[in-house]
């Protein structure tokens, strides 16, 4: 595929510098700053995570699954893909202590080191997670924790990328004052001998839900935050009330783990509840990390079974949870805007020379059905693999359940796939898009898919107000439009997304 000359020259210069033994600052191919280059050393101001200039920062990213089980997904290639395609600004390396983790197999720490080194090169933040779970009392392996964090802080004490999470989810017969706080004071003391200022996150009771207890008896370290964990299908307003209480007491919160599923990790997904949580976190500028990057066959996993371990994932490789999380990282304004998913929306690359034509099957301004008809044409000189191509029709669903029918397709309705995606933040003329994909087939130069006739309706068969929909316009004949966007493996190649 063709790339711009400027990008080619930039890549060539980076290659030559690397061959010459010189190290360039981490940056994207377009020369924009990475999250760490932009924000630098993090600290706490009141309840807010701030950058070196004292400006509020909201980090967003994803956590590994247990490194002893799914460590193959943690490598520079996968993290680079997550940075560039998902827009993550933080990655969490979840090193279980029990269940075949560090206590039984200390070599698993090498995967943590690999994650940190990759994050340093890529300019993203990284959380070193001492992932207690079945060993619910952090004091059970306190000396091992001190030994581990002594090593990590001695290695990375001068690295602004690093965040320490010293007790994932204390649970069982533990409480803040008697068990967790004394443990944290000892481990923090070990870290601070080597690292005076990087952020330290401390888990709270009841699987990191009792931030209210920590808020009433806070640690003295100036750069400590308190972990809040939730799973959207299980935890609701009662937990947000605890968070509000903690914030009112001046306790900074970091959501180092949350899932779209229920608390088991394998029930759901609960997207409406997830949206409610993300709206809340955005309103408070609370950083978050989603669980989890793996292909485990459970609903909280971001990837479908068998997905590549080194990135390069197509949208079809993502689970419902992964699709939602990626969309919501890309669809919000934070430090990730320096690492865009796609070229500028105003000037997308026309890599394959493909375009889309549209006509309205129902031109009524108010109708209980939306009936877009479209065809995709290959205007280029090379054959296009339709499995890599997706199209998005942007419109307003107004939080109603959506239904899809393919009435006719020259390439066969059985070859057309679809999904509805609700935007975390509505855009001009759209709170939802219909994404079409194709199971197989190719387009030779000059060829077209032919007519694809679609029909959408609300669950309750209520009317749509099409006149304000971004992708809609009234036309009885096929016309080229840039308000229906096309993507190659998730990368925008035709059209303009709504603002």
Swiss-Prot record:
Q: Which UniProt keywords apply?
A: Carbohydrate metabolism, Cellulose degradation, Glycosidase, Hydrolase, Polysaccharide degradation, Signal
- Residues bound to substrate are 65, 69-70, 96, 131, 231, 263-264, 291, 296-298
For this entry, list what GO says about its biological process. cellulose catabolic process; glucan catabolic process
Active site residues according to the UniProt entry = 169, 257
Listed under catalytic activity are: Endohydrolysis of (1->4)-beta-D-glucosidic linkages in cellulose, lichenin and cereal beta-D-glucans
EC number of this enzyme: 3.2.1.4
Indicate what this protein is called per its UniProt record.
Endoglucanase
Q: Name one Pfam family in it.
A: CBM_3
Top EC category: hydrolase
